[in-house]
């Protein structure tokens, strides 16, 4: 059993992946639904999906961070990293205020894990006090699960598609993250990054973090020549 503010797994939650740093774009409805769900006294369930995993994990990290600040007990389970833990880690999670399950598609075909998630879902449903957030890379019915009952359970409740950001929205998301970190990302530099790098937000944010550190060390503002030098572009 977890005590308040502890995570069920000894995993690092990025301190810059909060609700404040999430640029919603066309996902304002999903963001509002998650904020409402995690603050309800009774149980709730939301499933959301997208091909880009970065935004999904960001929202789950943000939900965990939000409730941890209120001394609520939360659990975050990244199923793409399940090689590092066993299904029994889910035991007792039905007593937490929030359970976030990331990358549900990763367990497709793994009967032991499918049954463990199914049983946890049922326990959460029975007790009725836990908010359950699950993310995947496709709608529930398109995941090739061996356990039909789990596929049916995942299809209950609220289901959202996390809409991708446009290039202009990605630029705004990068500038927001830079502002929260205490530096400025000029528009021309941001557009250069979008043009030269993989457009997945996780890749862009990693580059932004690298540039932030390099600019502090070099005591320089971000310019295109500086970015080219640091990122070897």
Swiss-Prot record:
Record's keyword annotation contains Metal-binding: no
InterPro entries given in the database record: DnaA_dom, Hda, Hda_Enterobact, Hda_lid, P-loop_NTPase
Domain of life assignment: Bacteria
GO biological process: DNA replication initiation; negative regulation of DNA-templated DNA replication initiation
Keywords: DNA replication, DNA replication inhibitor
Protein family (similarity comment): Belongs to the DnaA family. HdA subfamily.
Function: Mediates the interaction of DNA replication initiator protein DnaA with DNA polymerase subunit beta sliding clamp (dnaN). Stimulates hydrolysis of ATP-DnaA to ADP-DnaA, rendering DnaA inactive for reinitiation, a process called regulatory inhibition of DnaA or RIDA.
PANTHER family referenced in this protein's UniProt entry, alphabetically: CHROMOSOMAL REPLICATION INITIATOR PROTEIN DNAA, DNAA REGULATORY INACTIVATOR HDA
Record note on quaternary structure: The active form seems to be an ADP-bound monomer. Forms the RIDA complex (regulatory inactivation of DnaA) of ATP-DnaA, ADP-Hda and the DNA-loaded beta sliding clamp (dnaN).
Protein name: DnaA regulatory inactivator Hda
Species whose genome carries this gene: Photorhabdus laumondii subsp. laumondii (strain DSM 15139 / CIP 105565 / TT01) (Photorhabdus luminescens subsp. laumondii)
């Amino acid at each position: 059993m977890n005590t308040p503010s502890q995570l069920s797994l000894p995993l690092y939650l990025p301190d810059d992946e909060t609700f404040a740093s999430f640029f919603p774009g066309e996902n304002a409805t999903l963001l509002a639904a998650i904020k409402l769900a995690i603050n309800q006294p009774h149980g709730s369930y939301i499933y959301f999906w997208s091909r880009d995993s970065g935004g999904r994990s960001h929202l789950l990290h943000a939900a965990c961070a939000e409730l941890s600040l209120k001394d609520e007990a939360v659990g975050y389970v990244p199923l793409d990293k399940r090689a590092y833990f066993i299904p029994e880690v889910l035991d007792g999670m039905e007593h937490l205020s929030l359970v976030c399950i990331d990358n549900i598609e990763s367990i497709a075909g793994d009967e032991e894990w499918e049954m463990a998630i199914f049983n946890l879902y049922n326990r959460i449903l029975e007790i009725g006090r836990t908010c359950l957030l699950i993310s995947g890379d496709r709608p529930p019915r398109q995941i090739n699960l061996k356990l039909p009952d789990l596929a049916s359970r995942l299809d209950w409740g609220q289901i959202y598609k996390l809409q991708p950001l446009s290039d202009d929205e990605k630029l705004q998301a990068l500038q927001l993250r830079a502002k929260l970190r205490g530096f400025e990302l000029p528009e021309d530099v941001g557009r250069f990054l979008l043009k030269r790098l993989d457009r997945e937000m996780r890749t862009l944010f990693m580059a932004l973090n690298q540039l932030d550190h390099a600019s502090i060390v070099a005591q320089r503002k971000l310019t295109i020549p500086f970015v080219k030098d640091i990122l070897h572009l």
